[in-house]
Amino acid sequence: MKSTSILFILGLALLLVLAFEVQVGESDGECGGFWWKCGSGKPACCPKYVCSPKWGLCNFPMP
């Protein structure tokens, strides 16, 4: 019973990881949202964000 529970949890975790990877793979051509890695070789930030030169992340523009 204990090993069945462990296998079930591991299987569920693997399923969630694979689903996340598929979702990330589909978003290759999209723009980057909040805290998205930006810079050379990365997708550009969405129009409402700017790429922070200090951190290399998409963030809200400073006033």
From Swiss-Prot:
It comes from the Eukaryota. Keywords: Disulfide bond, Ion channel impairing toxin, Knottin, Potassium channel impairing toxin, Secreted, Signal, Toxin, Voltage-gated potassium channel impairing toxin. Disulfide bonds join 31-46, 38-51, 45-58. Residues 22-29 form a propeptide. InterPro entries: Huwentoxin-1. Residues 1-21 form the signal peptide. GO terms for molecular function: ion channel inhibitor activity; potassium channel regulator activity; toxin activity. One of its GO terms (cellular component) is extracellular region. It is found in: Secreted. Its main location: secreted. It holds the Pfam family Toxin_12. Expressed by the venom gland. Belongs to the neurotoxin 10 (Hwtx-1) family. 44 (Jztx-4) subfamily. Gating modifier of Kv2.1/KCNB1, Kv2.2/KCNB2 and Kv4.3/KCND3 channels. The presence of a 'disulfide through disulfide knot' structurally defines this protein as a knottin. This is Kappa-theraphotoxin-Cg3a 2. The lineage of its organism: Eukaryota, Metazoa, Ecdysozoa, Arthropoda, Chelicerata.
